[in-house]
């Protein structure tokens, strides 16, 4: 019975000894991956209400944000000299792209984001927004799961004249 499985510890033991060695590669806590060269945490591939599935290909769904803007906090935007509608260069260790800026208090200082689903070529030959995969690296990934660190890509943000 479940009661018998609780044993002397007084609860069900969820420790799987076969996984303990594998879990040792995980970090003990949050890791600040920012550097002086790349001081921002870029969330590359943020889900927004108009990027679900493939609806972002329909311009009607993204009238307010046709190119998947770079979201940045008011404090950071002021420090860099950016305002909503300006262009900013996003640079990471593996790539660089230019995005339209949206200044919003929904972002914490030190954090910026771009949505998923952009950077694709349109039928008319134009490209809308930034492709998050062009700013991320397969070599920079979680040691346990092997997935790229899309939610904290060290980045630099600069105003484009």
Where are these regions (language model features)?
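Long, low-complexity segments enriched in small/aliphatic residues
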Residues: 1-60
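Long, contiguous, secondary-structure-rich segments that constitute the structural scaffold
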Residues: 1, 5-6, 58-71, 75-161
């Amino acid at each position: 019975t479940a009661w018998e499985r609780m044993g002397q510890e007084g609860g069900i033991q969820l420790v799987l000894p076969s996984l303990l060695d594998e879990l040792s590669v995980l970090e003990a806590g949050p890791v600040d991956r920012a550097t002086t060269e790349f001081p921002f945490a870029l969330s590359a591939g943020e889900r927004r209400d108009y990027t679900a599935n493939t609806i972002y290909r329909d311009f009607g769904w993204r009238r307010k944000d046709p190119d998947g803007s770079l979201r940045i906090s008011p404090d950071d935007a002021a420090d860099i000299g950016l305002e909503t509608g300006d262009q900013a260069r996003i640079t990471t260790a593996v790539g660089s792209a230019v995005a339209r800026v949206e200044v919003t208090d929904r972002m914490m200082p030190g954090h910026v984001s771009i949505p998923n689903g952009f950077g694709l070529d349109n039928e008319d030959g134009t490209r809308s927004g930034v492709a998050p995969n062009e700013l991320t690296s397969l070599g920079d990934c979680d040691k346990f799961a092997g997935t790229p660190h899309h939610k904290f890509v060290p980045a630099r943000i600069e105003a484009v004249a």
